[in-house]
Design a protein with these regions (language model features):
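Active-site gating loops and adjacent loop-to-helix segments of metal-dependent hydrolytic enzymes
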Residues: 38-65, 110-114, 172, 229-232, ...
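H/E-rich (His + Asp/Glu) clusters that bind or coordinate divalent metals
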Residues: 173, 180-279
Length: 279
């Protein structure tokens, strides 16, 4: 198995635990094992336990719904146990809960390890500009947090809605996770240049799209992210069928296709700047 040579620092801005009710199997131990095996220096992690809907966008049964506060509490334990390795993105539940005082207090009390609000417009079927979501965006602005959002798969998750949210909150960094999952990324690429506070990540994004983004806009607009460990501990290497992961391109091919500075921006420097990470 080809593992990445340990050279450039890597911050993975899109890592998960939880999500069993939705059908995922992603544990804290899997995250740590994968980070160790593939030399990931730091991970921003969100808890899929806060997912609200199935892959068919049907509400999960009440008995398996987990509050956003309980999901965050699990993340707080994980991050506190691994200082300097794990940061938090707070996965929220706009469809069923909305912003609560309890959630805000938990965030306010843990700003040293919380870096972003995590939206999932597909698993909440709620647009980033929906009135249920706007209080979360205002919260991000209040506490100088970024907003990261899944894009792609349904109307609510169309990248244009995150662009519209970015225009509403110009002081908040917004990250288009996936750059429109399941698309040719063209819409997201065009939107990337229309708002200074709008960024993209590499999660399931072909290397060619990232190269095009750097060509158009310079090296400050894209972040490395992976969805690990969604395909298991070896997400960075292959899927469960043994098929090569596109992240191997990011580790072994991309460094020969862009400048060293651009590669370092993508793999860690942009994350430090955009999220305000202190290592």
């Amino acid at each position: 198995m080809q593992e990445r040579e340990e050279k450039t620092m890597i911050i993975d801005t899109h890592v998960h635990i939880g999500g069993e009710a939705v059908g995922f199997h992603m544990t804290e131990q899997m995250v740590l094992e994968s980070m160790e095996k593939y030399h990931i220096d730091y991970a921003l992690v969100s808890n899929g336990d806060a997912g609200e809907m199935t892959h068919k966008q049907e509400l999960l049964p009440d008995e398996v719904q987990i509050t956003q506060e309980k999901a965050l509490q699990r993340m707080l334990v994980f991050a506190r146990q691994h200082p300097g390795k794990i940061g938090i993105q707070v996965w929220v539940k706009p469809y069923l809960q909305g912003l609560t005082k309890e959630l805000e207090t938990m965030i306010q009390d843990n700003l040293d390890i919380i870096y972003a609000v995590k939206l999932h417009p597909f698993h909440s079927n709620t647009s980033p500009t929906d009135e249920k979501v706007l209080p979360y965006l205002a919260l991000a602005e209040k506490y100088h947090l970024a907003v990261v959002s899944h894009t792609g798969g349904c109307e609510a998750a169309n990248p244009v809605h995150l662009y519209e949210a970015a225009k509403l909150f110009p002081k908040v960094p917004f990250v288009m996770v996936h750059m429109g999952l399941g698309t040719d990324n063209k819409e997201a690429l065009d939107l990337l240049g229309k708002a200074d506070n709008l960024y993209g990540d590499t999660t399931w994004v072909p290397m060619s799209t990232t190269i095009e983004a750097i060509k158009r806009y310079g090296s400050k607009k894209m972040l490395f992210g992976s969805d690990s460990p969604i395909d298991g501990v070896d997400t960075y290497f292959c899927n469960p069928k043994g098929e090569r992961s596109l992240y191997q391109d990011y580790f072994h091919v991309l460094p020969e296709k862009i400048s060293g500075d651009a590669y370092e921006d993508l793999m860690y420097r942009n994350a430090i700047r955009i999220f305000g990470i202190s290592l």
